[in-house]
UniProtKB/Swiss-Prot annotation:
One of its GO terms (molecular function) is magnesium ion binding. Pathway: Pyrimidine metabolism; dUMP biosynthesis; dUMP from dCTP (dUTP route): step 2/2. It catalyses: dUTP + H2O = dUMP + diphosphate + H(+). This is Deoxyuridine 5'-triphosphate nucleotidohydrolase. It is an enzyme of class 3 (hydrolase). It comes from Photorhabdus laumondii subsp. laumondii (strain DSM 15139 / CIP 105565 / TT01). Substrate binds at R71, S72, G73, N84, L88, I89, D90, M98. The gene is dut. The keyword Hydrolase applies.
């Protein structure tokens, strides 16, 4: 299923120096977001920084949202993950996409202008309506959690 999402280019380098986000393969779920920087940013161990992507989006469909997720290689190889772990973009948001990066590693890491720093994935939304009850219908699991089902 393909859905059109309104994207506004805020930084004129996008489409010129930095490519527009595209799906890498037909099976890709995420589009890479790039750091729209004038100069490289060095992240010291433990440091967080809010980086612009140069893109604004308006999803405009209440049945969709977007999540900003880390790129696996940055986290696994360099210890750089999202500062808020996951970013949620609501359908009515119309501002610039910003990415909070956090260096949880023990070495400084430099982010270059145009470097891919995160990915955005569009997801369906179900808005819940709470139904107040006194008790739940009994299930096999019950209230067991946090390892209740074992390790193997």
């Amino acid at each position: 299923m393909m859905k059109k999402i309104d994207v506004k280019i805020l930084d004129p380098r996008i489409g010129e120096e930095f490519p527009l986000p595209t799906y890498a393969t037909p099976g890709s779920a995420g589009l890479d977001l790039r750091a729209c920087l004038d100069n490289a940013v060095e992240l010291a161990p433990g440091q967080t920084e809010l980086l612009p992507t140069g893109l604004a989006i308006h999803i405009g469909d209440e049945q969709l949202a977007a999540v900003i997720l880390p790129r696996s290689g940055l986290g696994h190889k360099h210890g750089v993950v999202l500062g808020n772990l996951v970013g949620l973009i609501d359908s009515d948001y119309q501002g610039q996409l910003m990415v909070s990066v956090w260096n949880r590693g023990d070495k400084a890491f430099t982010i270059q202008p145009g470097e891919r720093i995160a990915q955005i994935v569009f997801v369906p939304v179900v808005q819940a309506e709470f139904n107040l009850v006194e008790d739940f219908e009994t299930s096999e699991r019950g209230s067991g959690g946090f390892g209740h089902s074992g390790r193997q």
